[in-house]
């Protein structure tokens, strides 16, 4: 049910539906919920509202009173639609507010965000060497996990060109797999767009 609710909120952009969750987030009523799935749903749907600040999520992550709550907020960070999200999250990684071991997964999430992905990638490129320094070498390749969710041809090409020139440690095989998936997705999207342009709707 939680997944269905989130997908509905994400793709329908039903303001009334989303505000039901943002009201709970702003009032902090959700913090009293024992149902972990619903708690996570409030965080994920509220993050779709651009008026909800990433700083709110990050502060809750920093001040969480249990490992479980910390994990919930950490995993929610990349999905927050606030335009400042990429900058704030990447700064938190660089100053080690967020553990380096968790960084690749969050960077992957930032890249795959449907609205903030392009900006996230630009900031990641600018800080590439410093980001690699704060994360364990064996986890850095997980940054590539965000590539299958990229459908923009220009961003996809830029990512591939950059990573080929600035390869991740011990990630040659994974890089090839992710690039193949990325290119397949872009090709599929382009073919669908081509069909739709030629289609005649009565």
What are these regions (language model features)?
Residues 1-202:
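Long, ordered, helix-rich scaffold segments
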